[in-house]
């Protein structure tokens, strides 16, 4: 007959756990009793009350009729309304977002693509906000100046549309520069994007944030560079990456992005070290080749 040997340390640990559990149960019971002491019918000693409270007299006054005092009625209604207020909706929304985050992690562990998960999650969040945070209807936003006699305002002539400096700098890039790549082919334009597109771009960049890519150097050699060396926030990198032609379309379709092309695009504008090391002509060629290869897939 075989004997089972039990380690004495395991027994002592189990006994300690049992003692801690008993102490926890006793503490909970004491807290419950303390919190429900006012329900036990225990008398309150008047002598133990503060002096100011002891001087108070309790008179059985007749209840005032609210019919003759409409102000009291309104006050009572306001108090009742405040008593019936529900929990702060922002707290409920925060717990809802926490649950959404847990669901996203679980789906990603099963191998489902982040772009598909995020697009479904955005729709769920929009429907939740629309159901629990309705827009107040019937409210107008008229200014007080409309109550006075309106003054005739001369219409201003329409001004010519102005482009952002960033767009001007992108479109007016010279075919050859000393500190950056050549101008890329803008035949593949970027359409209006949404939050899910930015999320897909950020997801793919984050996956390869420390991966090093080969770039041509000025000395006819190569050097390695990655997104970490940019010393930039991921959000800023995503904003710059949106300027690469065709990136938004690839992200919308959930396809792989030309990360080396994106890295070269961002680094050529924000990294002085990269500008000093890279060969501009060769960089432009490999960026264009990467972009054409990914767009043709």
UniProtKB/Swiss-Prot annotation:
Post-translational modification: Phosphorylated by host PKC and by an unknown kinase.
GO MF term set: RNA-directed RNA polymerase activity
Organism: Australian bat lyssavirus (isolate Bat/AUS/1996) (ABLV)
Protein name according to UniProt: Phosphoprotein
Pfam families: PP_M1
Motif Nuclear localization signal per record, residues: 211-214
Gene that produces this protein: P
UniProt entry tagged with the keyword Phosphoprotein: yes
Transmembrane segments: none
Compositional bias (Polar residues): 134-150, 168-180
């Amino acid at each position: 007959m075989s004997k089972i040997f039990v380690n004495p340390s395991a027994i002592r640990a189990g006994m300690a756990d049992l003692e801690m559990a008993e102490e926890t149960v006793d503490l909970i019971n004491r807290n419950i009793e303390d919190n429900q002491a006012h329900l036990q019918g225990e008398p309150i000693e008047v002598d133990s009350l503060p002096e100011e409270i002891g001087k108070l007299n309790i008179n059985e006054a007749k209840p005032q009729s609210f019919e003759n005092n409409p102000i009291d009625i309104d006050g009572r209604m306001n108090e009742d309304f405040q008593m019936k207020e529900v929990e702060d909706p922002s707290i409920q929304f925060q717990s809802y977002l926490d649950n959404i985050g847990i669901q996203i992690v679980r789906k990603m562990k099963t191998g489902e693509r982040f772009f598909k998960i995020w697009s479904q999650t955005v729709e769920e969040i929009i429907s939740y906000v629309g159901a629990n945070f309705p827009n107040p209807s019937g409210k107008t936003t008229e200014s007080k100046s409309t109550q006075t006699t309106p003054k005739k305002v001369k219409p201003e002539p329409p001004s010519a549309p102005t482009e952002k400096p960033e767009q001007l700098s992108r479109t007016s890039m010279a075919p050859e520069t000393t500190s950056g790549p050549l101008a890329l082919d803008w035949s593949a334009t970027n359409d209006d994007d949404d939050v899910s597109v930015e999320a897909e771009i950020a997801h793919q960049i984050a996956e390869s944030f420390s991966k090093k890519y080969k770039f041509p150097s000025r000395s006819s050699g190569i050097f390695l560079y990655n997104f970490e060396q940019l010393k930039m926030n991921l959000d800023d990198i995503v904003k710059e990456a949106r300027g690469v032609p065709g990136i938004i379309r690839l992200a919308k379709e959930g396809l792989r992005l030309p990360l080396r092309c994106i890295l070269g695009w961002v680094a050529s504008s924000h990294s002085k070290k990269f500008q000093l090391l890279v060969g501009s002509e060769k960089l432009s060629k490999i960026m264009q080749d990467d972009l054409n290869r990914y767009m043709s897939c």
